[in-house]
From Swiss-Prot:
NCBIfam families: pept_deformyl (TIGR00079), PRK00150.1-3 (NF001159), PRK12846.1-5 (NF009484). GO terms for molecular function: peptide deformylase activity. GO terms for biological process: co-translational protein modification; translation. Belongs to the polypeptide deformylase family. The active site is at 134. It comes from the Bacteria. This is Peptide deformylase-like.
Amino acid sequence: MAVRPIIRFPSPLLTTSAERIGRFDGTLRQLSDDLVDTMRAAPGIGITASHIGILQRLTVIEVDPQTGPRSFVNPEIVWQSSETAWHTEGSVSMPGVAEEVERPVRVRVSFQTLDGETREEEAEGLMAVCLQHEIDQLNGIFWIRRLSRLKRERAVKRFEKFNRAEAFPGTQ
């Protein structure tokens, strides 16, 4: 297991659709383990292979440390509720920035396990938000595209300011 470097916004890899996974082997398990380590180190509660520059349809989500991380291979939303709610979102690829995003409150997702078993399950609350956010990422939709133009521009400016402060501590 290893912490991998995270691709930062505005890399074009973050707006590129990931490829379906067809091989379920030790390499996939290793990638999943590395994603868990990288997500926790970021820190974050969700990450995709795209975030580390690997364009494969794998996401790891950990909304509750008690239940641990979950891996979703080739996830797809097959149903979503018409009821929506606003939630604060951000990205490990755009640290220092968070905004309110409106999403359906419940979703049903079809996915495969690390062993290749196909499953379908319904999620609500934070897990539903995370699944939608990470599946968007796998589809090449970076989260700020869900914002209004004005909010998106402000988010980018905040990120640029965060990057300057990170590169040159003590400056603004």
